[in-house]
From Swiss-Prot:
Pfam families: Trm112p. GO terms for cellular component: cytosol. This is UPF0434 protein HSM_0997. Belongs to the UPF0434 family. It comes from Histophilus somni (strain 2336).
Length: 65
């Protein structure tokens, strides 16, 4: 994922920053606890395509407790 693209792309629901998850090829919104898939290098930023995530996946500091 292009770092410059990550600087300008935002969650279409809350307009918050997205974090790139290279292992699962998705962009994560920590605020809404959802992920947007990346297909063939293109982020699919449609709310109906978003995948719900558990809180522990979106808050890495909780995993270390």
């Amino acid at each position: 994922m292009n770092g410059r693209l990550l600087e300008i792309v935002a969650c279409p629901i809350c307009q918050g920053r997205l974090k790139y998850d290279s292992e699962n090829e998705q962009l994560i919104c920590h605020f809404d606890h959802i992920a947007y898939p990346i297909k063939q290098g293109i982020p699919i930023l449609l709310s109906d395509q978003a995948i719900g995530l558990s809180t522990s996946l979106t808050n890495p500091e909780q995993q270390n407790q």
